[in-house]
């Protein structure tokens, strides 16, 4: 495993995705990436229900790749993706049983 993967695997995946697009002379667009996200998500769901843990892990990685491609298609820089991840972590960490509850659909929802 190379040094860039060990230091920041998400950034390495971002760069790998850019390089993949470059090798095939592909410019990601929302019209390409959104169907790919739907396809890869369906494959991840199928793997989660019927396939091995290793297959699920691979499909999850594929969902991340095509989602990063959507960010690229929209011109969103890697740093903004990371900022969004940090914001989600902050929000998740702030959710407690005092502020949220588990609704009947098993979704953590804000108390009103």
Q: Where do the language-model regions lie?
A:
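Flexible "arm" and connector segments at domain edges
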Residues: 1-60, 64-112
